[in-house]
Every structure is written in structure tokens, then in C-alpha cells.
Amino acid sequence: MQSYQQPLRVGVGGPVGSGKTALLEALCKAMRDHYQIAVVTNDIYTKEDQRILTEAGALEPERIVGVETGGCPHTAIREDASMNLAAVEALARKFGNLEVIFVESGGDNLSATFSPELADLTIYVIDVAEGEKIPRKGGPGITKSDFLVINKTDLAPYVGASLEVMERDTQRMRPQRPWTFSNLKKGEGLQAVIDFIVERGMLGVRG
């Protein structure tokens, strides 16, 4: 039987449209020359996020697997993660030397969490366009994720959101837990996410 190493599994969750797929694309492009990476995406009825990442050239197509969850996307990453676990294992066996597998959840709500059997680290993405109140609404995505990304800071003036208020509320809701503002269109905040993954995932700095 061919042996393979167990990769670091990083769960990426967040509401629809918050920027999960954009974050994954940016992470893959920034890290692929230094680490062996693969991705599992989740969509309810399609494999749209897999297609987006493939067409963007985030990774080689065979390193990106789409899972059609059906029903509630929360269930597929928490209560019954069997489809995702199977996809992760299949990728790990196929490549043998994978160091990181990103698992992107389908669009979900603030209560969504990853099963510890599926994700070693969790990143949760929200966006400023949802309003400055989002951090203080709490929920496990806000309070319990290992790293929080508040994306689309460039939209703050257009939606009447105060980044100062969001910063204050975030620090109050998740004291001692890391987070960052980001504008992924310009790459802002990306390095903070990479540094977190490398440090907490004990990957070793390369490049």
C-alpha cells in the first residue's frame, strides 16, 4: 500500500459572497511555489467554486476537487463530514506529499463550524458590506474560529460601516484570537493569513 503524509487541513468558512473563494485563490497562488497544496470546495448543487478556482489557475486542475453537498452546507462540514473527509483522503493518497489541503465550506451562517475531524485550523471570512454590526453578532464563526478575516474594507464608505467600530467589536468578541482586515482585490491582509497558517500549522517558512 502506498504511504502518504497527513497534510494540514485548513477549513475556510463564511457567508455567501464574503470572499472565501477569492481568499483561496490568493492563498494558492501565493503559497503554491513553496508548499504542496490541494483544495476541496463545497457547493450545494453545483461545483461552481471548483470551476472558478480552476479557471483562475489557482492550482493544477487535478489538485482541486468539488463536492456537491446537497441540502445544508453546514451539515457537510460538521455533523456528517464524510464526503469531505473522503475527498481529503483521496487527494492525500493521490499526491502522497501534500502539506496543506484547504476545505472551503458552502455559503453558511455565523453558527457554522468545522468538525475537528475535518479541519486542524479554521479561517472564517466575513465582509464589511454585511454591515459593521456583524462582528458583535457573534456566533462560532466570529468567536471560535482560529483566524477571522474581515474582507472588502474598501466598501466601508459606501455602506456606512466604521472600521474602527468593527475593530473594537472584533477585539471584544474574540480576545486573544488573531484576525485581520483585508481587501483581497489589492492583496491587503493576505500576508497575515499566510503567516498564521505557516506559524500555527508548523509548516516552516519558505521562499
UniProtKB/Swiss-Prot annotation:
Ranges that cross the membrane: none
Keywords: Chaperone, Cytoplasm, GTP-binding, Nickel insertion, Nucleotide-binding
Family matches, as InterPro entries: CobW/HypB/UreG_nucleotide-bd, P-loop_NTPase, UreG
Single GO MF descriptor: GTP binding
Listed PANTHER family: UREASE ACCESSORY PROTEIN G
Family (UniProt): Belongs to the SIMIBI class G3E GTPase family. UreG subfamily.
Name this protein carries in UniProt: Urease accessory protein UreG
Natural source organism: Pseudomonas putida (strain ATCC 47054 / DSM 6125 / CFBP 8728 / NCIMB 11950 / KT2440)
Organism phylogeny: Bacteria, Pseudomonadati, Pseudomonadota, Gammaproteobacteria, Pseudomonadales
